[in-house]
Amino acid sequence: MSARAVALAALRRIEGDGAYANLVLGPALERSGLDDADRRFATELVYGTTRMRRACDALVDRFVATPPDPATRTLLRLGAYQLGFAGVPAHAAVGETVALAPKRVRGFVNAVLRRVASTPMVWPSEWTRLSYPDWIGERLVAELGEADAIAALETMNLAPPVTVRDDGYVQDASSQWVAAAVEVAAGERVLDACAAPGGKSTALAAAGATVVAGDARPARARLVAANAARLGLGVATVAADATRPPFPDGTFDAVLVDAPCSGVGA
């Protein structure tokens, strides 16, 4: 299976079933047999196409009179991302993506992607170009001014650097700062109320705290437990709504609430 085929299958799960990108892509890569370079390419295609979805649709919709079915739409997005944002040569982006299309739509996909490749884009708005909803751009303009708002969104579209803790756990630097801000002492009891996937909980446990990690979804709580076990750390987990914590007052010395993000992909 090619990197593009793995990416397409993952994108269809994400877009069709509302699945989490990271939970879909990891197992898909493990099953794929791809080498490291192709794994990186598949990862870039999945996260990049998801991140730039609005912009990819704008690139495609100039040449589409009737909305395509969801599976074809996903394939067109994948091709448009390669052409518009991934720096893939046009012949490869078009040819390899068309090869993934069912015969009944292969000519359509080929025609649309060739036009995307050959036609300069005039973006209808900065928010379309940056692939954010209008309301996010407008709110940031109100708070920061237009130039700083655009700069902020451009920065958020950049792939973050990979940061690895001393114990080998891959965790964004900003998440590491959140855990460090708790300043726990050894033996203190800490509740990490919105814990999945477990990076902050395991960092607190590694610092000597007794940690209870909670998440509203049982599957997400199990993910915390799995990550803690992999690191050899004792973290108790509970599936619980942090707005109604099942603990009496005074149970913990500290409570960390790194509340769930907005889900905008930034």
Regions found by a protein language model. Name each.
Residues M1-A266:
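S-adenosylmethionine
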